[in-house]
Amino acid sequence: MQQTDALLDRFLAGLAPASPLAVWAHGSLAAGDHVEGRSDLDLIAVLPQPPGPGAVWRVAVLHNRLRAEPLAGGLHCTYLSPDTADDAGRRHLTWAHERLLRRPVTPVTRAELHTSGRVLHGAPPADVLPPVPDGELAAFVLRDQRDYWRPYVDRADLWTRDVWVDLGMLTHARATVTLREGRLISKREALDVLPGLGAPEEVVEDIRHAATADRSRPTRRGR
C-alpha cells in the first residue's frame, strides 16, 4: 500500500505543527480489509484543545494542499480534543468528501477504535476515549437500522444501484451480528454472514468481487 502510506505520511507531517496528541485509523484500514484505491482512509486526530477559527482554517489548508495526492479524495478525518472526547453525541470538526463539516464520533466508531484501532501517532484510544457500554452500542445500531435504513427499503429505485446494494447489505449483516453477539465485525466478515441471512449467493459473490477490486478498474457490474 505504497500510495496509502505516502498519503498518511504527508498528512501526519502536515498536521505536526498542530501538536496532535494522537492520530488513529479505524474502519477498513484498521480492520485489515483495506483495499488501496477502493477503501476510504478513516482517521481520528486528537488535538490539545477544541479547534478555534484559526485551527479550523489550518485544517482546511492542510487538506486542500493534499487534494492533488493520489487517494486524497478518500481521506476523512475527525478532530477531537480531550475535553470533548467523552460526549458521543457531540459534533466535531471533520474533513470528509473533500469539505469541512461537523459530525459525531458514533458508538460504532468508538467501539472500533477500542477493539481494532490503529495508532498512527501518539496515545492509544483507551487513553482518551471512555469504553462504550454494550447497551449504548446496541441501541445505536438498532436505531440506525430502524431510523435510517428501514425507510429506504421501500425505495426500489435505490436498490438497482451498486453502492446501495453493497453498503445496505453489509451494514445489515454487521448490525445483525452486533445485536445478536455484542461484537463488531469487518465488511469482509460480513460477507460470510450474508448467505445465512438469505442473501443470494450470486449477489454476495458480486459484492465480494467489487470489494476487492481496484477502484480504477471496471468490475462485473461496470463500476
Q: Where are the regions that the model predicts?
A:
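Catalytic metal-binding acidic patch
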Residues: 27-61, 65, 74-81
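Conserved NTP/Mg2+-binding pocket subregion across the NTase superfamily
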Residues: 61-161, 169
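Structured mid-to-C-terminal alpha-helical surface segments
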Residues: 183-223
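Short, solvent-exposed loop/turn segments at secondary-structure junctions
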Residues: 30-31, 84, 174-177
